[in-house]
A protein has these predicted regions:
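Membrane transport/envelope proteins' first extracytoplasmic loop
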Residues: 1-237, 242
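Short cytoplasmic-facing helical segments at TM-TM junctions of multi-pass membrane proteins
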Residues: 244-249
Length: 249
């Protein structure tokens, strides 16, 4: 278990650089103007559009649709292929497993049929939290997916959420500095736009929960092993003591 957990935790940590995971994200009511983007970028950050639309799926769940990402929060293809047509979709692997969906199946959302071409993992949704303040994730009733830009345009645009991801031009050295940078950025950002949500990476459950969970499991198993060793030592000690007494008698 410890070897497997260590390997998974190492792969998880390496994914931050491999998939260029965001330093945070924020959501606004309407799309930012070019002048606003320029002003915000002057605070030593690079902005990336990460717009999404949520729609109900015919199986009773909610799907969050994204365009395929190439720059930040890059997609990890687990099985099959990424969508290339406007009626194709690649969905989160865990969501697919929990809802018994296979590559080649068809999902219906908003009256449109989507052919599942592959299973993916989105690095900013390593755990499927629909809202960051949720007490627990739900990989059954909530899923994430990627579609082509043309496919995205066929969705209900009235439900479009203007979410932006950011990366610091110079990465923080530690979590303490990261918190200070995030607080300063939020303060500056709040003077320029009306924020609907602001989630720095260190507070993002969808990104951090998996790593935190694996780390805590490892610590718990180590403590458990120590307890087992102490118990075994006690039992062996009693057994040896009794054996010596019998032999002496």
């Amino acid at each position: 278990f410890l070897v497997a957990d260590g390997s998974m935790l190492r792969a998880y940590n390496e994914g931050f650089e491999k998939y260029n995971i965001e330093d945070g994200n924020f959501r606004v009511k309407k799309e930012l103007a070019s002048s606003q983007k320029k002003d915000i970028s002057a605070h030593n950050v690079t902005l990336y559009q990460n717009f999404y639309i949520e729609q109900a799926v015919d199986n009773g769940s909610t799907m969050r649709f994204f365009k395929n990402r190439n720059d930040v929060n890059r997609v990890c293809l687990m099985k099959g292929t990424l969508p290339t047509k406007s009626d194709e979709i690649a969905i989160d692997r865990m969501y697919a497993d929990n809802n018994h969906i296979s590559v080649g199946d068809v999902l219906t959302s908003g009256g449109k049929k989507w052919k599942v071409t592959g299973f993916v993992a989105l690095p900013d949704y390593s755990c499927l939290f629909q809202n960051n303040n949720d007490s627990m994730f739900d990989a059954v009733k909530f899923g994430v997916s990627v579609v082509t830009p043309k496919g995205f345009e066929t969705l209900n645009q009235d439900k479009l959420q203007y979410s932006y991801s950011w990366l610091y031009d110079k990465a923080p050295k530690n979590e303490r500095q990261e918190k200070k940078m995030a607080e300063k950025f939020m303060e500056s950002l709040g003077k320029k736009v009306s924020l609907e949500a602001f989630v720095p990476r260190y507070q993002n459950q969808a990104i951090n929960f998996t790593g935190d969970d694996m780390g805590s499991d490892k610590a718990m198993m180590i403590v458990l092993l120590y307890i087992v060793i102490v118990i075994m030592a006690f039992v062996f000690g009693i057994t040896i003591s009794n054996t010596i007494r019998k032999e002496a008698g």
